Design a protein with these regions (language model features):
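Short, flexible, glycine/charge-rich loop motifs used to bind or transfer phosphoryl groups or to couple energy/partner
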Residues: 16-18, 171-172, 218-221
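Radical SAM/AdoMet-radical enzyme domain recognition
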Residues: 1-107
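A C-terminal junction/extension of Radical SAM enzymes
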Residues: 97, 108-199, 236
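Flexible loop/turn segments at secondary-structure boundaries
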Residues: 9-11, 36-37, 77-79, 109-112, ...
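A structural signal for well-ordered alpha-helical scaffolds and beta->alpha junctions
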Residues: 51-54, 82, 119-130, 224, ...
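Flexible mid-to-C-terminal extensions adjoining Fe-S/redox cofactors in radical SAM and related proteins
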Residues: 189-190, 194-280
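Amphipathic, soluble alpha/beta structural segments
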Residues: 65, 79-91, 154-180, 224-250
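Residues immediately flanking
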Residues: 31, 186, 233
Length: 280
């Protein structure tokens, strides 16, 4: 059994989880800040889960050899916390534990309906923080947010063990032909992308009626968009998010161009200069 939770009720269930740990494959929780920044963060995010209790439960679960997958989603409120969180996990010895994983995500607004724009940071902003982590980067630290820049971060060895698998010309795992992953709600409705879960217009069908073994999910690449094929960034963004493109293609296109150009200026050009040992 895989358990995914924001962790609010985890402290109350810890005893049962430990007792039944033999049937639990992983517990995925979210920790977006350390205790000293907790009160400041929830004023804006409105997401309350007691970080001190979550950290204590994480320690307990790891002790009993339960696989714990900690996710941290970064935005403007907590980006400065990336290195402190890393050092906290490092000092606790978590990166040397086989049953610990840290997955790093990015807060976004794929459907342009959250009104959260001013708090969203770019892929490049997070990458610049990750690049400050001492090498070698732990193998159980996983980026889960690199999409626009992934084809280039792979070549620069800056993908930080990116966990989702995406095709070369595909924006993310959701529109790639590889991972056959689906989300199921309490009515057995199927969804493909985490952003779409709970939204009726994105239901793929019902588990009672669909043969998942033979179901072919929709794929999408920049080759499906005529505008991408003449774009000056040459399709490197892989066409952007399909959900965003369906709502406002021009807006998401401008966002992807801005992301790509920021990556070029802040990371790619300095990295190439460093590798060529040139300063001009």
């Amino acid at each position: 059994i895989d358990i995914t939770t924001n962790g609010s009720f985890l402290p109350y269930s810890a005893k049962k989880i430990v007792i039944h740990r033999s049937i639990i494959s992983v517990i995925a929780i979210t920790i977006n800040t350390l205790p000293d920044k907790y009160n400041e963060t929830i004023k804006i995010t409105k997401v309350a889960n007691n970080v001190e209790e979550l950290l204590a439960v994480t320690d307990l679960l790891l002790h009993y050899h339960i696989v714990v997958d900690v996710g941290t989603n970064f935005d403007r409120n907590n980006l400065s916390e990336l290195l402190p969180i890393y050092h906290y996990f490092f000092d606790k010895g978590y990166f040397s534990k086989w049953n610990f994983h840290w997955n790093i995500g990015r807060v976004d607004d794929r459907l342009f309906d959250t009104g959260y724009d001013e708090y969203i940071v770019s892929e490049t902003d997070i990458l610049l923080q990750l690049m400050k982590i001492p090498k070698p980067v732990p193998s159980n630290l996983h980026a889960g947010f690199i999409q626009t820049c992934k084809n280039l971060t792979d070549k620069l060895n800056l993908s930080f063990n990116e966990s989702p698998i995406k095709g070369t010309y595909h924006y993310c795992w959701n529109v790639s032909p590889y991972d056959r992953v689906f989300y199921i709600d309490n009515e057995l409705n199927l969804f493909r992308c985490t952003v779409t879960v709970g939204r009726p217009q994105y239901i793929l069908g019902n588990l009672k009626d669909i043969d998942l073994m033979n179901y072919q999910h929709e794929t999408k690449s920049f080759l499906d968009y005529k505008h991408c094929q003449i774009c000056h960034i040459g399709g490197f963004c892989s066409g952007g998010c399909k959900l965003s493109a369906d709502i406002d293609f021009v807006k998401q296109c401008e966002m992807e161009k801005k992301e790509f150009e920021k990556f070029m200026e802040a990371i790619l050009i300095p990295q190439v200069r460093e590798k060529l040992n040139r300063n001009d």
